Amino acid sequence: ACGSCRKKCKGPGKCINGRCKCY
């Protein structure tokens, strides 16, 4: 469960294998 990656990254992000990857 990533939750909201956009909020965690404070920008664009993607959920991969249950983790947020930020761009």
Curated annotation (Swiss-Prot):
Region (Interaction with Ca(2+)-activated K(+) channels): 13-20
KW GTP-binding (keyword) present: no
UniProt-annotated site: Aromatic residue of the functional dyad, residues: Y23
GO molecular function: potassium channel regulator activity; toxin activity
UniProt site positions, description: Basic residue of the functional dyad: K14
Highest rank taxon of the organism: Eukaryota
Principal subcellular localisation of the protein: secreted
Record localization: Secreted
Record flagged with keyword Secreted: yes
Tyrosine amide carried by residues: Y23
Disulphide bridges: C2-C15, C5-C20, C9-C22
Keywords of this entry: Amidation, Disulfide bond, Ion channel impairing toxin, Neurotoxin, Potassium channel impairing toxin, Secreted, Toxin
InterPro entries registered for this protein in UniProt: Scorpion_toxin-like_sf
GO cellular component, one term: extracellular region
SUPFAM superfamilies named among the record's database cross-references: Scorpion toxin-like (SSF57095)
Tissue specificity remark: Expressed by the venom gland.
Assigned protein family: Belongs to the short scorpion toxin superfamily. Potassium channel inhibitor family. Alpha-KTx 13 subfamily.
Biological role: Reversibly blocks Shaker B potassium channels, with a dissociation constant of 200 nM.
Domain notes: Has the structural arrangement of an alpha-helix connected to antiparallel beta-sheets by disulfide bonds (CS-alpha/beta).
Protein's name in the database: Potassium channel toxin alpha-KTx 13.3
Native organism: Tityus pachyurus
High-level lineage: Eukaryota, Metazoa, Ecdysozoa, Arthropoda, Chelicerata
